[in-house]
Amino acid sequence: MELPTYAVSQSLLASRSVSSPRGDQPVRAATNGTQGQGQGQDGQNLTGKRKRTNPGYPSRESPKGSSSRCNGLTQYAVPASFQSPQIVQYSPPNQILRTPPSNDVDDQLSVNSRSEPVYPTLGVPGAVRQTQEQLQLHAARIPASHFLNNVPNFGYHSTDKDVAMKQNYFSDSTFFPSPAITDTWGELPAPDLSWETTTRPHSPGNRATPTVDKHVSVSAFEAALETGELASDRSIQNAYNAPSTTGDNHLETLVSIQDGLSQVLKAVEAAGFDSLDSAVIAYYQRSSKGNEWLRQEQRLNRMRRLPVLLKELHLAAQGWGQWERRNFQEQIIKSTEDILFAELQDHLATRRNSPHASPCSIEQRSQARQHMMEHDADPEAEFYDTSHGTEGIPADEMLHVNLLLY
């Protein structure tokens, strides 16, 4: 069996022992190149038997070069630099892998509280590792806004700008691009948000022009009211915008109001109404039909505001003249009498229908008549003598009527 031959350089033919792969016997390489060639020539006559090599002595038979066989395996002379390699991986110093701090302006955590970088480096030299630790310490001490501003590939660069806008109470137009928030009103007048409509009337430009119906007089009246109101508002608006420091402007304002009222009265007359009151009554009667909300509002007004109105009229009548006050009081008395008699009739009808009711005796009727005659000295008592419907009223109910009247 012919053995393979190998060509090995002279630098590798050093007298150095090579450990066996199995660790049983060291193998000594040949030191003479001619000897190796001779052995190679002698090795051509070898058979397939395995031969041993003594430790410390050169091998008698070896292939061409520095290769030898030990335990059936071919051994080679390897330099010392290749026998114990020290593999070190260096990371580029310009590309430092670190975890950026959180995006918090007030983040002042210590180095020990932060987590380690998620990108570890293998076999980093001491100088590079120290540089990384210094950079991490610097990144932990500075605010996150400065760190993010110095990172070129970070997608958000407006940290300092946002902080400045927060300090300026969001007055920067780039934060709120809407002109309705940042810009001023300009030449437009400020909106009227107060309840006082007499001092600052609303602009008539926002009102829609009403549609006039020729067949319905109320619709014509509504259109006339809108037209007159528009003219009046326009005159009031002009008077408000104009300087009112002189008396001439005040007179012009009064003339404008009178012109507006005259136009309203002409429109009321053209619509077929006798007066402005009748037009207003017709307007509210027509508007209240089918409007449940307005009907409920009218009920509440009768229950709450009508008594207040009557009380105000009664107090205001104290300052009127005698004849003016007398007519007003007579009308109130007549209305009160009608209300009382209506209530008494309902009461008597209820007593007649009751099974325990007793007819009114003659004595009770005479007592009631006598009680009425005692009040003849009163100048207003003649008003009660003219009514003969009280003869059939019992004495106790008649007393109730007199107490209510006086």
Swiss-Prot record:
Subcellular localization, as worded in the UniProt entry: Nucleus
GO cellular component terms listed in the entry, alphabetical order: nucleus
GO molecular function, one term: DNA binding
Keyword annotations: DNA-binding, Nucleus, Transcription, Transcription regulation
Bias (Low complexity): 7-20
Family, as annotated: Belongs to the bZIP family.
Function: The two putative transcription factors FPSE_09188 and FPSE_09189 could be responsible for orchestrating expression of the W493 A and B biosynthesis cluster genes. W493 A and B consist of six amino acid residues D-allo-thr, L-Ala, D-Ala, L-Gln, D-Tyr, and L-Val/L-Ile linked to a 3-hydroxy-4-methyltetradecanoic acid polyketide chain.
Protein name per Swiss-Prot or TrEMBL: Probable transcription factor FPSE_09188
Organism expressing this protein natively: Fusarium pseudograminearum (strain CS3096) (Wheat and barley crown-rot fungus)
Native organism taxonomy: Eukaryota, Fungi, Dikarya, Ascomycota, Pezizomycotina
